[in-house]
């Protein structure tokens, strides 16, 4: 795997989105990984619908939080519409997937990255954007302005984001708090730092979608 990678430079990352005030980070993280693999496989970068997951993926809890695996499974089973077709409303509503027209993006499966294993995660990110979790509760994270973040934070995670690259000393994470947060909506978080769970628990629960050629 390369020493560093930034999927933004490869055109596989849509502009930073904003989930607020809804607790829908899980949908944004999942969708960003699917936008990424879809671009890698098809050559097209298409902004996809978080709102569809919020409204239609019933195993998660809408604006009260959700999960990486059921949301990925939803897209395996149903596909996901584009952002344009099913735009974000900042709140959970009735599932309108059946009423929507236009193309959908599908994935064929998803895979779990071995937990608390830096090299496995780096190898995964070298291939595509990956859904990861962090502890975002601390003021340092909430009000992060730039640089390589080392904490303070715990490893009890509460927030899903998307790893879209790495360097020698950091992971590059796409957040869903709008472009005015952090480094234009991104955070660089310190790699390894002697904690097997990673800085802010970033190595504890990571998934990526698999997409065949369809």
UniProtKB/Swiss-Prot annotation:
Enzyme class, UniProt record, top EC level: hydrolase
Disulfide bond sites: 22-63, 56-95, 153-200
According to the UniProt entry, what is the EC number of this protein? 3.4.22.-
* Entry's Gene Ontology molecular function annotations: cysteine-type peptidase activity
Where it sits in the cell: the answer is:
Secreted
Q: What is its main location?
A: secreted
Cross-referenced InterPro entries:
Papain-like_cys_pep_sf (IPR038765), Pept_cys_AS (IPR000169), Pept_his_AS (IPR025660), Peptidase_C1A (IPR013128), Peptidase_C1A_C (IPR000668), Peptidase_C1A_papain-like (IPR039417)
**Tissue specificity field:** Expressed in latex.
Q: Which GO terms describe its biological process?
A: proteolysis
Name the domain of life.
Eukaryota
UniProt KW Endoplasmic reticulum keyword = no
The similarity annotation says: Belongs to the peptidase C1 family.
The family database entries (PANTHER family) matched by this protein are listed as:
CYSTEINE PROTEASE FAMILY C1-RELATED
Protein name, per record: Mexicain
The protein's organism comes out as Jacaratia mexicana
């Amino acid at each position: 795997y390369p020493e560093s990678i930034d999927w933004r430079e490869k055109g596989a990352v849509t502009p930073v989105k904003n989930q607020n005030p809804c607790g829908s980070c899980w949908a944004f993280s999942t969708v960003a990984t699917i936008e990424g693999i879809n671009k890698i496989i098809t050559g097209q970068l298409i902004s996809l619908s978080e709102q569809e997951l919020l409204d239609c993926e019933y195993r998660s809890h809408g604006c009260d939080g959700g999960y990486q695996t059921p949301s990925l499974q939803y897209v395996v089973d149903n596909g996901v519409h584009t952002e344009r077709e099913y735009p974000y409303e900042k709140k959970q509503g009735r599932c309108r997937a059946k009423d929507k027209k236009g193309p959908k993006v599908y994935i064929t499966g998803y895979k779990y990255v071995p937990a608390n294993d830096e090299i496995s995660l780096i190898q995964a990110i070298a291939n595509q954007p990956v859904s990861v979790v962090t502890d975002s509760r601390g003021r340092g994270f909430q009000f992060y302005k730039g640089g390589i973040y080392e904490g303070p934070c715990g490893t009890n995670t509460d927030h899903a984001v998307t790893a879209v690259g790495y360097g020698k000393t950091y992971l590059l994470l796409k957040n869903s708090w709008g472009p005015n947060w952090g480094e234009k909506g991104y955070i660089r978080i310190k790699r390894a730092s002697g904690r097997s769970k990673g800085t802010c628990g970033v190595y504890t629960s990571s998934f990526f979608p698999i997409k065949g050629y369809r």
